Amino acid sequence: MDQNRSPNGRDCREPPSPSSTARPGLVVIAGPTATGKSRQALLLAQRLGSPLLNADSRQVYREFDIGTAKPTPAERALWPHELIDFVDPRHTYTVAEFQQAAQARIAAAHRQGQTPILVGGTGLYIQSITAGLGIPAVPPQPQLRAQLETWPPEIRYAWLQQLDPVAAGQIHPHDEVRTLRALEIIYTTGKPASYLRQAHPPDYPILLLGLHCPMPRLEQRIARRTAEMLAAGWIEEVKTLRQRYGPDLPLLQTLGYAEIGAYLEGRIPAAELQPLIVRRTRQFAKRQMTWFRAMPGIQWLDCEAEDLPEQIWKRVTAWMAAQTSAGTTPAVAARPPADP
C-alpha cells in the first residue's frame, strides 16, 4: 500500500480538507464563457467531496449539449453534476425556478455539513443566490408571449429598453428568451423586473471566485472552442433540434444556435458562420464581464495560470479555515484590469 495515501485514497501529504469543521457555506466559480469554469469546478468538487451545482441558464435544458458547452458524459461520470440537463426544451425555465431549486439543494448540502460549489456564467442565476434577489415568481403567460412574439426581435428589445433600461442593460440584444421573459414580467406585474428584485442576502458565508483573462486571449479561447464545437457536430445538433421542435423554439434563437439556424436556411454563407459566432460570443463575454465586475466580493484568478487548480484550492481552504476560526472571509483580491 502507498504510504502516502490514506485508506480512502486521499494523498496524506495534502493538507486535510477543512470541510468537516468549517461552517458550511457556498463556493462560487463564475466568469465569462470559455474560461474553463466547469473544469476547475469539477476538480475542486472532487477534491472537497462537495456537491457541484450548475448555474448556466442553457445547460439546464436537455438535448442542448454541444452549443451550450455542457460537461460531457465522461466528465459527468467523474462526479455528479446537479441542476443540469433536466428541463424540457419547450419549457421556459425561469430564474425563480432555478433559485428555488438551487436554494433547496444548498440547504440539503448544509444539513450534511457540506459546502457546495456553484459554477456558471449566468450572472442573474448566480446573483439570485449570492445576493438573495427577490425574483418575481411569474409563471409563463402563453397568450401574452404569443402576442409579444409577433413583434420583430429588435422592436421587443427596444421596447424593453424603454420600459426597464436596467434589465435591458443586463440582457444581450440577441437574447430573445430573456428579453421576452423581462417583458412578460413587466406586463404581468405592472412593474419592471429590476424593481421587483429586492435582495435578501443568505445567512451563510460565500466565497466568490471569478476566472478571467485579457480579451485578446479570451477571444483566442472562444475561437478555438467554437471550432471544436463545430467539429464535434454542433450543426448536426441544431438540425436535429429544429426537426424535433421546429425552428421557432425560443432556445434555438439563442447565441450560436440562431446563427447556425440562419446558415441552414441559407441566410449566412458557410465561410461567415464561424467568424460570426466568435464575434457575437466575444460581445457576450464582454457583457458577462461587465456583470461580474459589478458583483461585490469577487476574487479574480487568471484562467490560464498553470497552477490555477492549486490557486483555487488555497483560496478555498484559507476561506474555510477563516469560517472555523473567526467566522469572517478573507480579504477580497484586486479586480482584473480593464480590457482594451
From Swiss-Prot:
Q: What is this protein called?
A: tRNA dimethylallyltransferase
Name the gene behind this protein: miaA
- Where do the segments described as Disordered lie? 1-25
Q: Which Pfam families match?
A: IPPT
Question: What is the stated purpose of this protein?
Answer: Catalyzes the transfer of a dimethylallyl group onto the adenine at position 37 in tRNAs that read codons beginning with uridine, leading to the formation of N6-(dimethylallyl)adenosine (i(6)A).
The reaction(s) catalysed by this protein are: adenosine(37) in tRNA + dimethylallyl diphosphate = N(6)-dimethylallyladenosine(37) in tRNA + diphosphate
Q: Where does ATP bind?
A: G31, P32, T33, A34, T35, G36, K37, S38
Record's HAMAP family?
IPP_trans (MF_00185)
Supply the PANTHER family for this chain.
Answer: TRNA DIMETHYLALLYLTRANSFERASE
- Could you read off the lineage of the organism from its UniProt record? Bacteria, Bacillati, Cyanobacteriota, Cyanophyceae, Synechococcales
What family is this protein classified in? Belongs to the IPP transferase family.
> Which organism encodes this protein?
Synechococcus sp. (strain JA-3-3Ab) (Cyanobacteria bacterium Yellowstone A-Prime)
SUPFAM superfamilies per the record?
Answer: P-loop containing nucleoside triphosphate hydrolases
Subunit record text: Monomer.
Give this protein's Gene Ontology molecular function annotations.
ATP binding; tRNA dimethylallyltransferase activity
